A protein has these predicted regions:
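Short amphipathic
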Residues: 1-8
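Short, Lys/Arg-rich amphipathic alpha-helical interaction segments
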Residues: 95-112
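Amphipathic alpha-helical interaction surfaces in cytosolic regulatory modules
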Residues: 9-46, 50-98
Length: 112
């Protein structure tokens, strides 16, 4: 089992959606950390635990771009099967993120 603690491994102050909007964006997190750990977990047939606690909160745009964006890059069912979220501080984030993953896949289909 692999783990990313966003606060420890990325930042305590997550930013907006895109790199062009400033530091610590969802896009930066996905491209620089999440994607690589996700692919490593898939190759090892392991879960990737995402620990959300410890920071100063998340913009919805950060979460959608990071996790919804991953589901636009890779099959939605594989993303859902591989990622597991932990949030004792704000448990509702887990459902919110799973919804972004599910709906990101639908948006991808509509673009074609």
């Amino acid at each position: 089992m692999m783990t990313i603690n966003i606060c420890r491994d990325f930042t305590e102050t997550p930013g907006a959606r895109y790199k062009s909007e400033g530091e610590f964006s969802g896009e930066e997190f996905r491209d620089d950390l999440l994607k690589h750990k996700y692919l490593e977990a898939r190759a090892r047939n392991e879960k990737l635990i995402i620990e959300l606690d410890g920071g100063y909160g998340y913009a919805t745009s950060f979460l959608e771009e990071a996790f919804g964006g991953l589901a636009r890059m890779y099959p939605q069912n594989e993303v859902l099967d591989t990622l597991s979220f932990v949030s004792n501080d704000e448990p509702s984030l887990i459902k919110e993120i799973n919804e972004y993953i599910i709906h990101a896949n639908d948006k991808k289909k509509r673009k074609h």
